[in-house]
Regions:
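N-terminal helical capping/dimerization or prosegment-like subdomains
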Residues: 1-90
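General beta-strand structural signal in soluble alpha/beta enzymes
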Residues: 60-63, 109, 142, 169-171, ...
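Short, internal active-site loops enriched in acidic
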Residues: 65-67, 74, 146-150, 257
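Active-site metal-coordination/substrate-binding segment of hydrolases
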Residues: 77-144, 150, 161-163
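Midchain, well-structured core segments that form catalytic/ion-binding scaffolds
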Residues: 149, 155-157, 161-275
């Protein structure tokens, strides 16, 4: 019965998911770490709550930080948590990352899997309960945060100012069941040795918690550079260019395989290939 209901609702679910995936909700963290976390995160939260209202569900906006869509009126509650903020968009997308498309049964858009689809999934759990008039001894709440990708300051703020559910569930994509998360370090590394003057730039294209799949270096022309280029790896492409002052340079682009920072062995680091 549930499978048939989901199949029937799928076209509308895709429309709802498309509505929020069109919003470029990259979180912006103010110095005091307090909400809101940028105008686009405010907008996507308002849009998600509006969808909940359209289905006749109770909604609440907690200071443009966290949103809640509720089914039931029990004194105690179970929370289903997701987040609507996304990591910044890099290059090399085949589609506009904020104009969702469906190909071979998959929706392609920035933030679709991480984590807007979980928000819409939780909404449809509540909608199923409502349409089937299922009575629960507690409230079932879908919570949506807006700064998970940049430090989870939304949760810090919510816990400090509002009452939390008695039980919280976090259906974060395909990760295994767990009760915690790995630690992380965000910082800057500085080399003691000076960098060659022939190196104009070195960069990679990836999110904060991802193995980079693209890395680029621009170097001034030199005999040894030509020698290195001639013996380059097949995964490195080379393009001749000119600097602003008209001197010849080379742009080296390495292609790796992206992966989540929690499982780096699943990828191939483009920076490592380039170096």
């Amino acid at each position: 019965e549930i499978a048939l209901w989901v199949s029937d609702k799928m076209p509308q679910l895709v429309k709802d998911l498309t509505r929020i995936c069109r919003i470029p909700s990259v979180a912006v963290v103010p110095e005091d770490k307090k909400p809101p976390y940028g105008p686009e995160c405010v907008r996507v939260l308002d849009e998600m709550l509006q969808i909940g209202k359209e289905y006749g569900l109770d909604t609440k906006n907690f200071d443009s930080c966290v949103g809640r869509i509720r089914y039931g009126d029990g004194e105690k509650s179970i929370g289903i948590w997701s987040h609507l903020d996304v990591v910044p968009v890099g290059g090399y997308w085949e589609h506009d990352p904020f104009e969702p498309v469906v190909e071979q049964g998959y929706m392609i858009a920035r933030g679709c899997q991480d984590n807007k689809s979980s928000a819409v999934m939780a909404l449809y759990v509540l909608l199923y309960m409502k349409e089937h008039k299922i009575k629960l001894p507690y409230s079932l709440d879908a919570y949506m945060g807006t700064s998970e990708e940049v430090g989870m300051f939304d949760i810090d703020y919510f816990v400090a100012h509002y009452q939390c559910p008695e039980l919280s569930l976090v259906p974060d994509s395909g990760f295994p069941v767990c009760c915690g998360e790995r630690g992380s370090f965000n910082g800057e590394l500085t080399a003691n040795d000076s960098v060659s003057e022939r190196l104009i730039s070195l960069s990679c294209d990836c999110g904060l918690y991802s193995v980079p799949n693209i890395a680029e270096a621009v170097v001034m022309d030199a005999p040894r550079i030509k020698e290195l280029i001639s013996s380059r790896k097949s995964s490195v492409t080379v393009e001749q260019m000119q600097t602003e002052n008209g001197k010849r340079a080379w742009k080296l682009t390495a292609h790796g395989i992206t992966a989540h920072g929690a499982s780096p062995k699943a990828g191939s680091n483009a920076l490592t290939i380039l170096c």
